Regions:
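Low-complexity, highly charged intrinsically disordered N-terminal segments
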Residues: 1-44, 160-171, 190-201
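Extended, charge-enriched "interface" segments that sit outside catalytic cores
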Residues: 20-38, 93, 97-140
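A phosphate-binding catalytic loop at a beta-strand-loop-alpha-helix junction
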Residues: 71-87
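Short secondary-structure boundary/capping segments
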Residues: 87-94, 212-218, 245-251
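Histidine-anchored nucleotide/phosphate-binding helix
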Residues: 95, 173-191, 215-219
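Active-site cores of enzymes that catalyze phosphoryl transfer or operate on phosphate-rich substrates
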Residues: 124-173, 177, 249-259, 270
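Short, conserved secondary-structure transition motifs
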Residues: 201-208, 232-246
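Residue-level detector of conserved catalytic or cofactor/ligand-binding positions
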Residues: 263-269
């Protein structure tokens, strides 16, 4: 049943009732699997240029960047990180308090290797009054996971992947956003050292992306001798997907239709 409030929400998003019905029908029917003949390999679909060919392609690209053409590195950066932490969310809600599954055990055994370890350690001290080793020694594993995922801590469970610390280096850790700035400097700078990078982001996270760029871009510009021109755009709300319950009825949050933004319908089906 579509209410007047629903109609107003759909109109604001630019989504028709027919589109909602189509999405629900797709959920019900499911999506056929592709029939794969083989894994991609050098013999099947992957090109492996030899040394001479590599030089030719690299020279061609280098020559192109030295023209007056505008090169823009385009980065879709709206993907949510919540699915990455599915197992940790399950542990947080489990009726046991110590790691039981192989995933849970490995997570805590290797926790110091994560790029976000230092930040998480600080978050644990702030939210639980102890650092990670002390919490683990006391058997308080869930406090560590809560500090990673929840808003009182790092809030990684609600952030897009582009803002999470992913890679660890001797001089610190980098988020994917930072890695794209570095990549842009290495292969997308024009003859004047200008690097154009465009990120698509979700509206609710745009300010966080902007803040991270403001914090980090100048240092990378200095390190690589480039000048960044960084821009953002937001995906249209008309591309949002309706959320459905286990009976394939539109899901409501406090009476309001819930939509999954920036996600394919097939992904939504798996989440259900």
């Amino acid at each position: 049943m579509i209410t007047p409030q629903d109609k107003e929400l759909l109109e604001n998003k630019g989504i028709s009732e027919e589109q909602i019905a189509e999405q629900l029908a797709c959920f019900e029917k499911g999506f056929p699997y592709l029939k794969l003949s083989a894994a991609a390999s050098v013999e099947k679909g992957i090109l492996a240029p030899d040394t001479d060919e590599q030089k030719k392609y690299l020279d061609a690209w280098e020559a192109y960047t030295q023209t007056d053409k505008v090169v823009v590195k385009f980065v879709p950066a709206s993907g949510a990180a919540s699915r990455m932490f599915k197992n940790l969310f399950e542990f947080l809600g489990a009726d046991y308090d110590t790691p039981q599954t192989n995933f849970e055990k490995t997570f805590f055994e290797k926790i110091e290797k994560f790029a976000f370890y230092d930040d998480l350690n600080t978050a644990c001290q702030r939210t639980a009054g102890k650092d990670i080793p002390a919490l683990v020694a006391a058997g308080n594993y869930k406090a560590v996971v809560a500090a990673l995922l929840e808003g009182a801590g790092l809030n990684y469970g609600a952030l897009p992947k582009g803002l999470l610390k992913f890679h660890k280096y001797e001089d610190g850790s980098r988020t994917p956003l930072e890695e794209h700035l570095v990549e842009g400097a290495l292969y997308a700078a024009n003859k004047n050292g200008k690097v154009n990078v465009h990120f698509t982001v979700s509206p609710e996270h745009r300010a966080l992306f902007t803040a991270l760029v403001d914090e980090k871009a100048a240092a990378y510009a200095k390190k690589y001798g480039v000048d960044y021109n960084i821009s953002f755009s937001e995906q249209k709300p008309s591309t949002d997907t309706i959320a459905a319950d286990m009976e394939n009825k539109p899901f409501r949050d406090n009476g309001k239709l819930l939509f999954l933004s920036l996600i394919h319908i097939s992904e939504a089906t798996r989440l259900r």
